């Protein structure tokens, strides 16, 4: 019997396949992106220590107050700018981008482009 896998399950499989290849170090941590139906999240992670160095999401009050909606491309752009600003304050300039199994399109692309424009290199 063939069972069709859900989109969520297929995304998780893609993410595991990507994570085998992408590793964040202290010199070049990993910028991980996750999006739910309502919010978008970004974290900068040092995988060697297992620590989250910087995070930002459209769930935060300071970001949410500037937005009309937390689930559109504008929210992703703002989260990208905020994560880049916080990373630069901590001295992080270069990162490895982890799209989390999501297609590099729409909100994920908007977050990446705005983080690049704000000064992160990847």
Curated annotation (Swiss-Prot):
Q: Which UniProt keywords apply?
A: Ribonucleoprotein, Ribosomal protein, RNA-binding, rRNA-binding
CDD domains according to UniProt? Ribosomal_L18_L5e
One GO biological process term: translation
Q: Note the superkingdom of the native organism.
A: Bacteria
A GO cellular component entry from the record: cytosolic large ribosomal subunit
Question: Which terms in the Gene Ontology molecular function aspect does this entry carry?
Answer: 5S rRNA binding; structural constituent of ribosome
What InterPro entries does its record include? Ribosomal_uL18_bac-type, Ribosomal_uL18_bac/euk
KW Secreted (keyword) present:
no
Check the record and name the NCBIfam families matching this protein. Answer: L18_bact (TIGR00060)
The entry's function note states: This is one of the proteins that bind and probably mediate the attachment of the 5S RNA into the large ribosomal subunit, where it forms part of the central protuberance.
Q: Which family does it belong to?
A: Belongs to the universal ribosomal protein uL18 family.
The UniProt subunit note reads as follows: Part of the 50S ribosomal subunit; part of the 5S rRNA/L5/L18/L25 subcomplex. Contacts the 5S and 23S rRNAs.
Protein name per Swiss-Prot or TrEMBL: Large ribosomal subunit protein uL18
| UniProt organism field | Dictyoglomus thermophilum (strain ATCC 35947 / DSM 3960 / H-6-12)
